Design a protein with these regions (language model features):
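N-terminal secretory/targeting leader peptides
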Residues: 1-84, 106-305
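A gly/proline- and charged-residue-enriched helix-loop-helix capping module
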Residues: 81-101
Length: 305
C-alpha cells in the first residue's frame, strides 16, 4: 500500500491506524505492508499505480482520478457523511463506478465531513457586485478538487502537489491556498497564511481503493477483515476529525490567524458558486461517459438538500 500524503499529516495517520487495526485483526489471514507515501510513488500517479496493479492499495483523494471516475464529485459536493452514504446506497454506487471505470474496489471513504477553506497571506477583499471573495490578481495553489470553483472566482491558479506549497508560499509564487479546515499547522503553512476565509465548503474525498484483480483473488475471510475495519473507520474517523476541528481552530487563533467572514449575501453566493461548479463538472463528465441518468441518483444519495 501507498498513501498520497506525508506521514505527519492527520489524514495519513488515520490510514496508518487503519493498517494497524487490519494487521492486528487479520493475523494469519491478511496483512497490509505500507511502502510509503509520495516519496515512493508521486501522489498524482498513485491512482494509476493501483489501477494497473503496481501496488495493491492506495489511500488518496478521489479527485486525483476524478476525470476517470466522475461520480467522485458527489463526495466533494456531499452534504452527507460516509456512514450515511454507506447506509443509503451511495457508497455501493460509488464502488460500482470504481469497479467499472477504474479497475479498483472502493473500500472506504474515510475522514469524511471535513470542509475546505481558502487561506490567504494578505487580507482578503470581497467583490462589491455579489459580496463574494475577490481573488482577482491573487495567485493561489490549485489541485483537481478546487479547479472549477477557483476559475469561477477568477483566481490565477498554480497547480501543484501539497508537498510543494510550503516552498511556493515562502518564495511568493503563491499567496493563497485552499486546504481542509484542519491541518494547516501540520504543514507549517501558518507561517505564511494569516487569514482564513469563512465559510468552509465541500467535503474531503479521501478513500482507500484496492486493485480489483487483487481484491477478487482474496479469500472471503481476508475481504471481510479489510471491509469490516474500513466500515468502522468510516464512522470513527469522521467523529475524530469533527473533534479535531475545535483544536485546530484554537491553534490557528493562538497563532494569530484572523477569521474573515462573508456577508450573508456574499456567503450564499460563494457557496452557490462552490457547489454549482462541482455539480456542473460532474454532469459534464457523466454525459461524456454516457451516464447522465445517474446524476440525479447521486445527488439524492449524497446531497439531498
Amino acid at each position: 500500500a501507498v498513501h498520497a500524503f506525508p506521514p505527519f499529516l492527520v489524514y495519513t495517520k488515520t490510514f496508518l491506524e487503519y493498517v494497524d487495526a487490519v494487521n492486528e485483526r487479520g493475523a494469519g489471514v491478511v496483512q497490509i505492508k505500507v511502502k510509503g507515501g509520495p516519496e515512493a510513488i508521486k501522489m498524482f500517479e498513485q491512482p494509476k499505480a493501483v489501477r494497473d496493479g503496481v501496488v495493491d492499495m492506495v489511500h488518496t483523494p478521489g479527485s486525483f482520478y476524478g476525470a476517470e471516475v466522475p461520480e467522485i464529485d458527489a463526495m466533494v459536493a456531499s452534504k452527507n457523511d460516509a456512514a450515511t452514504t454507506r447506509t443509503n446506497g451511495g457508497t455501493a454506487m460509488m464502488d460500482a463506478a470504481h469497479q467499472k471505470r477504474f479497475n479498483v474496489k472502493y473500500l472506504a471513504w474515510i475522514d469524511s465531513g471535513v470542509g475546505f477553506n481558502i487561506f490567504t497571506v494578505n487580507e482578503p477583499k470581497f467583490r462589491s457586485a455579489d459580496g463574494v471573495l475577490d481573488l482577482g490578481g491573487v495567485k493561489i495553489r490549485d489541485n483537481p478538487i478546487y479547479t472549477a470553483f477557483l476559475k469561477s472566482l477568477e483566481a490565477t491558479t498554480s497547480p501543484m502537489p501539497s508537498t510543494e506549497a510550503y516552498g511556493a508560499l515562502e518564495k511568493g509564487v503563491i499567496d493563497a491556498v485552499p486546504w481542509t479546515s484542519i491541518g494547516i499547522t501540520d504543514l507549517k503553512w501558518d507561517k505564511f497564511v494569516k487569514y482564513m476565509v469563512q465559510p468552509s465548503f465541500y467535503s474531503t474525498d479521501l478513500g482507500i481503493i484496492v486493485n480489483l484483480d487483487r481484491w477478487n483473488a482474496m479469500s472471503p475471510e481476508a475481504k471481510k477483515v479489510l471491509q469490516d475495519v474500513a466500515i468502522e473507520w468510516e464512522v470513527k474517523s469522521a467523529a475524530d476529525r469533527a473533534a479535531d476541528t475545535a483544536d485546530y481552530m484554537k491553534a490557528y487563533a493562538d497563532g494569530g490567524m484572523k477569521f474573515v467572514s462573508h456577508s450573508a449575501k456574499g456567503e450564499a453566493n460563494y457557496l452557490a458558486l462552490a457547489y454549482d461548479s462541482v455539480w456542473a463538472r460532474l454532469t459534464g463528465r457523466m454525459e461524456e461517459k454516457g451516464s447522465s441518468g445517474d446524476v440525479a441518483k447521486l445527488r439524492a444519495l449524497y446531497a439531498p438538500n
